[in-house]
């Protein structure tokens, strides 16, 4: 990870209460509406005044590569659930009521939860409460955006407070009303941890003057948009000032981002170049958004972080900041960026993903690094050289070919139309095709819940009844903190080649490179920069064993490859604990899931004979 400063490690901040207990940090997530990366002066934008946001960036961290969805509802669904839209997007203006949100999870951890601003995720009167929010002050909850031809969000807004309609008729300004409600919520809950989620109304069109505009009758859309961005900044400043007033500032993580790019009607200047807004587009103009994180005495100051951030990353980050475990029964695509902003050991993501479907149109998808971007159509762009994506690359360098292969592997993970290949090793939802190593039924220590195979207590290794030699095995895994497990293949008894499953950060074996996650255990080390997700999150894995060739894959990237008859193999084999085993690595045998005395989870185990 590249940073433009020297990091001084700081202790993880928290407030000590009079009782001696530790109060979990408060969490504020602010998401403006239609305000791209170029709209913040700290990012190099010069068209707008954003002093409060700039101060948060100066005294905290800002990211240069945060990517949203191209439109509001898709981004709201993704940020609240931590999942790609490919998994759970239903339609515009709707959040599937079966989904779990960060509000649900934080509420279970004792947080008071509040949402203010724009809803647009379902018109059921109980929607905010259903999705985990104790309190709400919202526009476009059960009512339409317009009433008798007039917009209802800005002057004299039509809102709903905790499900009750409230119309204002004395010149009140919608953004002021909802911001004041959030500030009041913080004051009422200052003695307990709270989550304040503020998907803003501003600066979405119609572009109208704000209470601070010089000309209250202005019809100049560009000027009015500029004033609306300034009012976004003012609302952020009001919230931060309230935290200061309450003495909560040092125990509150404040995050600011935006739901998508700027409106196409707006041109802005960024680093001396004019940028046309691109809301609804899959380009940077539609998806490159600001991200600022601030937490005094916990986040080092003046950080400029070039790591990638996906909108699915906010949920695990909030849970991480709350020191709360991620649920084991959810599929999450995000990973916490808290280590980056707090100056701790981090494992930056290698790519981000966007899935976008408008109405009944066919969905579009891409995966990207900071520089390169691959669409599901096969078009591959160097975004540094071609920001508007006019000229897809045709002739690739070896390095570009490698990046493209990684991005294709990532895309394949989210292809809803891709048929699962191979035989499901738990097709019956039980252990009928598995035994213990000594041939007994699997009766203790292992269980299956909602398709997840969970090693939860001592039960011993388990193996398939069928033996395999040449195959492709795909599976997902996650491990407990400081945990160890593995998937063995070409086995005899408990011996065999092993795809290592490990908490690389906390396990005592983490000083041995060939014992780290994804490695061919005790033989071939996975690279340090492998795309491993943190403890508690699902990693996708693949093992290919065909003849003498052995490959290990992790989250779409090949991390181990070796030929059993090669000089490299002979060298590492002689240094391993297996050196006395004749024909080791060439046996035909069962697939083995290891019981290494730690909780471990596996799912979607599918094998295809080669």
Describe each model-derived feature in a short phrase.
Residues 1-2, 8, 422, 427:
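N-terminal leader/targeting signatures
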Residues 8-9, 168, 211, 239, ...:
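A ubiquitous, low-specificity "background" feature that marks scattered single residues
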Residues 54, 292, 379-381, 488, ...:
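Conserved hydrophobic/aromatic positions in well-ordered beta-strands
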Residues 145, 404-408, 419-610:
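Carbohydrate-interacting regions of secretory-pathway proteins
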Residues 376-377, 546:
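Short loop/turn segments that connect beta-strands within the blades of beta-propeller domains
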Residues 2, 6, 18-376, 383-419:
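Formylglycine-dependent sulfatase
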């Amino acid at each position: 990870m590249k940073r433009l400063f020297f990091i001084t490690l700081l202790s993880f901040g928290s407030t000590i209460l009079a009782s001696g207990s530790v109060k979990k940090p408060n969490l504020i997530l602010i998401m403006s509406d239609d305000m791209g990366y170029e709209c913040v002066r700290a990012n190099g934008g010069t068209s707008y005044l954003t002093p409060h946001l700039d101060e948060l960036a100066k005294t905290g961290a800002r990211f240069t590569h945060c990517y949203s969805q191209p439109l509001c509802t898709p981004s709201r669904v993704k940020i609240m659930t931590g999942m790609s839209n490919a998994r759970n997007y239903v339609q515009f203006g709707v959040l599937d009521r079966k989904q779990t949100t960060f509000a649900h999870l934080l509420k279970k951890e004792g947080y008071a939860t509040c949402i203010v601003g724009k809803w647009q995720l379902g018109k059921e009167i109980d929607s905010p409460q259903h999705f985990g929010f104790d309190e709400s002050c919202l526009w476009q909850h059960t009512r339409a955006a317009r009433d008798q031809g007039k917009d209802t969000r800005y002057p004299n807004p039509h809102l709903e407070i905790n499900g009750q309609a409230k119309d204002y008729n004395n010149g009140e300004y919608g953004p002021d009303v909802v911001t004041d409600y959030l500030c009041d919520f913080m004051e009422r809950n200052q003695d307990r941890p709270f989550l304040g989620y503020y998907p803003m109304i501003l600066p979405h069109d119609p572009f109208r003057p704000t209470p601070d505009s010089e000309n209250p009758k202005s019809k100049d859309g560009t000027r009015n948009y500029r004033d609306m961005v300034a009012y976004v900044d003012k609302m952020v400043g009001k919230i931060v000032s309230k935290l200061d007033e309450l003495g909560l500032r040092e125990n509150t993580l404040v995050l600011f981002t935006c739901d998508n790019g700027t409106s196409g009607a707006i041109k802005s200047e960024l680093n001396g170049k004019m940028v046309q807004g691109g809301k609804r587009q899959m380009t940077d103009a539609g998806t490159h958004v600001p991200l600022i994180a601030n937490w005094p005495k916990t986040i080092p100051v003046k950080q400029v972080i070039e790591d990638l951030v996906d909108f699915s990353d906010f949920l695990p980050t909030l849970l991480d900041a709350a020191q709360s475990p991620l649920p084991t029964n959810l599929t999450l695509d995000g990973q916490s960026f808290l280590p980056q902003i707090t100056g701790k050991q981090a494992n930056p993501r290698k790519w981000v993903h966007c899935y976008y479907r408008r109405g009944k149109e066919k969905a579009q998808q891409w995966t990207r690094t900071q520089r390169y971007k691959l669409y599901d159509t096969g078009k591959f762009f160097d975004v540094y050289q071609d920001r508007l994506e006019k000229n897809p690359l045709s002739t690739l360098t070896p390095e570009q070919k490698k990046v493209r292969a990684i991005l294709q592997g990532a895309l394949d993970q989210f292809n809803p139309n891709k048929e699962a290949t191979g035989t499901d090793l738990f097709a019956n939802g039980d252990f009928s095709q598995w035994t213990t190593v000594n041939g007994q039924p699997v009766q203790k220590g292992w269980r299956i819940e909602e398709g997840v195979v969970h090693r939860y207590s001592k039960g011993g290794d388990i193996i398939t009844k069928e033996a395999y030699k040449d195959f492709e095995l795909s599976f997902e895994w996650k491990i407990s903190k400081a945990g160890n497990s593995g998937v063995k293949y070409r086995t005899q008894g408990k011996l065999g080649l092993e795809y290592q499953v490990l908490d690389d950060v906390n396990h005592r074996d983490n000083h041995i490179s060939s014992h780290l996650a994804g490695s061919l255990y005790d033989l071939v080390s996975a690279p340090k920069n492998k795309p491993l997700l943190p403890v508690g999150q699902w990693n996708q894995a693949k093992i290919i064993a065909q003849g003498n060739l052995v490959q290990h894959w992790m989250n779409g990237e090949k991390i181990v490859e070796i030929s059993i008859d090669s000089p490299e193999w002979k060298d590492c084999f002689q240094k391993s604990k297996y050196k006395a085993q004749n024909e080791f690595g060439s046996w035909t045998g069962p697939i083995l899931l290891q019981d290494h005395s730690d909780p471990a989870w596996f799912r979607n185990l599918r094998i295809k004979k080669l």
